[in-house]
């Protein structure tokens, strides 16, 4: 009998397949996105050094909005883009984290693009 994979297992497998191809550098870091039920998180990662350069989330103290809806995701995208531009980072590689490019993930990407990130 076949055993059905749960959603989180399938997402992790998709993420691993994508991570084989996507790699962030100091000049063009990886914009990694994670979506939980209540919040959304985004960070720019330099995979060569293994360090996070910039991070933003809906769980931060100064966040005005709700992290579980599209408007909140767009705000997080704008927040991470503003922090990246302050550090002189304009070009990034988008890593959707195994999530479908739809809904909150798509809104975060559009918010980051509107604020000035190029991907």
From Swiss-Prot:
GO-annotated cellular components: cytosolic large ribosomal subunit
InterPro entries: Ribosomal_uL18_bac-type, Ribosomal_uL18_bac/euk
Keywords: Ribonucleoprotein, Ribosomal protein, RNA-binding, rRNA-binding
Highest taxon listed in the record's lineage: Bacteria
One Pfam family from the record: Ribosomal_L18p
Source organism per UniProt: Clostridium botulinum (strain Okra / Type B1)
PANTHER family: 39S RIBOSOMAL PROTEIN L18, MITOCHONDRIAL, LARGE RIBOSOMAL SUBUNIT PROTEIN UL18M
Protein name: Large ribosomal subunit protein uL18
GO molecular function, one term: structural constituent of ribosome
Disulfide cysteine pairs (residue numbers): none
Gene Ontology process terms (BP): translation
Gene encoding the protein: rplR
Function of the molecule: This is one of the proteins that bind and probably mediate the attachment of the 5S RNA into the large ribosomal subunit, where it forms part of the central protuberance.
Family: Belongs to the universal ribosomal protein uL18 family.
Transferase keyword on record: no
Subunit structure: Part of the 50S ribosomal subunit; part of the 5S rRNA/L5/L18/L25 subcomplex. Contacts the 5S and 23S rRNAs.
